[in-house]
Regions:
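Class I SAM-dependent transferase core
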Residues: 14-71
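Short acidic-aromatic active-site loops that bind/stabilize oxyanions
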Residues: 2, 47-51, 189
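S-adenosylmethionine/decaboxylated-SAM
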Residues: 52-234
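A structure-centric signal for secondary-structure junctions around beta-strands
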Residues: 9, 32-35, 91, 217
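N-proximal short alpha-helices
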Residues: 11, 27-31, 80, 192
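Single conserved hydrophobic/aromatic residue that forms the stacking wall/gate
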Residues: 1-13
């Protein structure tokens, strides 16, 4: 019998993953009551919001980085924007972009309910069109939009990110599809799969970024922009 440490390790992790996540989430001290309400409403309406593990990690990053200006791509119903406004230790300004018309009024109402409407600015429309129009820099950017568009947003995102700033991208592992062969991925998901792989390669190989890919939730990347000579960025 092969008793090598690597044999069956993936199966062990797979079996234990759900129990581990449940245990880790049980240690969470929770959010404010309004965030709990908005989260439950989103879940009841099948609106995707950041997972519990990601919520904890985002709060940790905010406590460490204390960003003054935050850009979010992908508002949904405003849950993560409100969470960042609530748990950033400094009085930050948040700009968030949303393209789905049905969710925009819900997000606006949620900002008012949370008392964050003056702190959060919602830009309505396609991020691909809005990002090029932005000129002020940000010290924290959270990407949680259409996964197949991350690679297309990247040039403007990096232009807007301050040196020393943090870029967080959510849902980058695609429920494990990212490690599969191209042919093992369902045909309708192959374009997203290809683009996400390109995005992850760019994040981890650019000289002006230091990036970690972490198995938090459905996978996240955390990148810091560093100063390099112009001809060394690629």
């Amino acid at each position: 019998r092969d008793r090598s440490p690597s044999r069956g390790l993936g199966d062990v992790y797979k079996r234990q993953d759900e129990r581990l996540v449940t245990y880790i989430n049980s240690l969470d001290t929770g959010n404010t009551s309004i965030l709990d309400q908005i989260e439950q409403e989103a879940l009841d309406s099948y609106v995707p919001i950041i997972r519990k593990e990601m919520q904890q990690f985002l709060k940790l990053l905010l406590a460490m980085k204390r960003p003054m200006r935050i850009l979010e791509v992908g508002t949904a119903v405003g849950f993560s924007a409100i969470l960042m406004a609530e748990y950033d230790p400094v009085p930050c300004e948040i700009t968030t972009i949303e393209n789905y018309e049905k969710r925009i009024p819900i997000a606006k109402e949620n900002f008012i309910r949370a008392g964050k409407e003056k702190q959060i600015t919602l830009l309505e429309g396609d991020a691909a069109q809005i990002l090029p129009t932005l000129t002020e820099s940000y010290d924290f950017i959270f990407m949680d939009a259409a996964k197949g568009q991350y690679i297309h947003f990247m040039p403007d995102i990096l232009r807007l990110l301050k040196t020393g700033g943090t870029l967080v991208s959510d849902n980058v592992l695609q429920d494990g599809d990212i490690i599969e062969s191209h042919y093992a991925v369902i045909r309708r998901n192959r374009t997203i799969y290809k683009r996400m792989r390109e995005y992850l390669y760019e994040l981890t190989h650019r000289k002006d970024l230091v990036t970690a890919v972490l198995p938090v939730g459905d996978g996240i990347t955390v990148s810091t922009k560093v100063e390099v000579e112009n001809d060394e960025k690629e």
